[in-house]
Structures are given as C-alpha cells and as structure tokens.
C-alpha cells in the first residue's frame, strides 16, 4: 500500500511543479513582450528550477511504477516531458534566436 501512496504523491508533486513551471513561463513571456528582459530571465530561472523539481518527481514516479505506470501516471510523465520543450522554446526566445 505504501508504494501506491508514494506513486500518488510523486504524480501530484510532478503535476504541481508543472503548474509552477507554466506560471513562471507565462510571467517570463509577459515580461519579454513588455521588453523587461531582466524580469523575464528571472521568471525563466524560477521556471527552470520548478521543471527540474517536476523532472525529479517524474523519474521517481517511473521508478516506483517499475516501468509500468498507469495511464494517468503516464500522462503526468508526458506532461513533464512536454514542458521541457516549452521551456527550451522560451530560452530561444530570450536569447533572440
């Protein structure tokens, strides 16, 4: 039973950190649009930290599921992975490339 509790907690934490990542990416994009590059970079850094935390919980969830996650767990894992692409695109926009 402990494993199921741990899996649920890992999934919830991963999704919570994804929500934080989205929040700070949104803030970074807002400031970037306003030409406030310094503030945009600060928000990017926070988003990057949140995504790093989400990735930790994604890896933990994968480990706890013994490489056989439920559909709901797999979707959470995929959300974390997709946020890596979103953050990468923001980094490109911040660098002007």
PLM regions and their residue ranges:
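Long, low-complexity or tandemly repetitive, helically biased scaffold regions used
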Residues: 2-97
């Amino acid at each position: 039973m402990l494993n199921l509790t741990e899996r649920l907690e890992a999934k919830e934490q991963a999704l919570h950190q994804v929500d934080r990542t989205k929040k700070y990416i949104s803030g970074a994009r807002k400031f970037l649009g306003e030409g406030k590059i310094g503030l945009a970079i600060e928000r990017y850094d926070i988003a990057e930290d949140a995504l790093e935390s989400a990735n930790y919980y994604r890896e933990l969830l994968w480990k706890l599921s013994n490489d056989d996650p439920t559909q709901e767990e797999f979707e959470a894992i995929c959300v974390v992975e997709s946020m890596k692409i979103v953050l990468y695109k923001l980094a490109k926009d911040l660098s002007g490339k």
